């Protein structure tokens, strides 16, 4: 059966690769299929020595190779675009968008197992891909699904820690407090205190990471129920997968909403290592802080208005358009409202990206989902109009490198359609999703023995004294 599944999937990929004249995709996929009979832990245990040797060889052969010049503009500009991190799980291309272990979002949708035929990829499949670089079988994904369900037990003191906060506290504050309380059970901290050898530290890191990934949807769902509903805990459904169960525990059982949550978690899981949340998690973990502490720090970065709060602000802005112009807003009215926003010194939320220079493929796959499941939704139709109206206006301004929509331009409208309309909560959904990418990389940080992060800083005085003016 395994060989039949592989042959069928390979046939699909060869057809797709032929259409795109890209044979490398099928070659890469063949490489990724080795050791398909092993469970997740066994695969990691087999891979890690090979990757450790690979890293040693890279350091030996290429350690002195230069990656580029750093200018003062880069130093005072947030290190934007500076290559300075090793991040194995994903890579962001300015034109193609994110690739998870070399696979684009459309390729992941094609190759990763789904809950139903032609459905969205299961987040467990992406987690397997991020950790191993291999496309899992449906049986492997089902096994990982069960493992995560078995790990998804949250102690009572976690709920009590959240309950100690006012209900009015921001959802991210309550979510972060719950994650902090989970840290009490850290296996990495216990192993470190007992003197675990550095070469084995990836194993308790893996245990913590899988426990954390399994439990954060439970904590997040409780935060939602506490703030917006009756405060009751909806138990997990052992027949459902990770994304489906998250939707269920939030109180949404529409099959289309379950599919949306699978897609949402998958595409929000990772976006290489330089964004605030990913970099923060990596930085804190480099001090040998356990995965709970590291992910908590990442969440606090994600809560910032310039990072994870953007998806919240998009829906609020779109609703403000409807409030002022009505649902049947004309193109001219929409142009006027966009200019009004820009002339007031604000940005149009959901457009532009620090790295991407084309439409975010995460936006595109959400648009395809909407066209399939909710083509007549008024807010979706408004988002479609914005796609036509906003980029030309931003291009005309001449100050924007990327006028195209990003992932945040669409997600709120989809969630709102199925009843999850509380925009203030959206960053929590983002946080749950990002646990997959951050924790996967933390395991590899420990497996590869990556060092403490310690860049050099300078003062304005130092710059003025030591740097000559550019010619």
From Swiss-Prot:
Signal peptide: none
Active site per database record: 307, 353, 408
E.C. code: 2.3.3.16
A Pfam family recorded for this sequence: Citrate_synt
Entry's Gene Ontology cellular component terms: mitochondrial matrix
Single Gene Ontology BP annotation: tricarboxylic acid cycle
Top enzyme category: transferase
Catalytic activity, as annotated: oxaloacetate + acetyl-CoA + H2O = citrate + CoA + H(+)
The keyword Transit peptide appears for this protein: yes
Record key words, sorted: Mitochondrion, Transferase, Transit peptide, Tricarboxylic acid cycle
Compartment(s): Mitochondrion matrix
Record keyword Mitochondrion present: yes
Gene Ontology MF term list: citrate (Si)-synthase activity
InterPro entries attached to this UniProt entry: Citrate_synth-like_lrg_a-sub (IPR016142), Citrate_synth-like_sm_a-sub (IPR016143), Citrate_synthase (IPR002020), Citrate_synthase_AS (IPR019810), Citrate_synthase_euk (IPR010109), Citrate_synthase_sf (IPR036969)
PROSITE patterns: CITRATE_SYNTHASE (PS00480)
Pathway field: Carbohydrate metabolism; tricarboxylic acid cycle; isocitrate from oxaloacetate: step 1/2
Transit peptide boundaries: 1-18
Family affiliation: Belongs to the citrate synthase family.
Description of how the protein assembles with itself and partners: Homodimer.
Note: Citrate synthase is found in nearly all cells capable of oxidative metabolism.
Entry protein name: Citrate synthase, mitochondrial
Species assigned in the record: Citrus maxima (Pomelo)
Phylogenetic placement of the source organism: Eukaryota, Viridiplantae, Streptophyta, Embryophyta, Tracheophyta
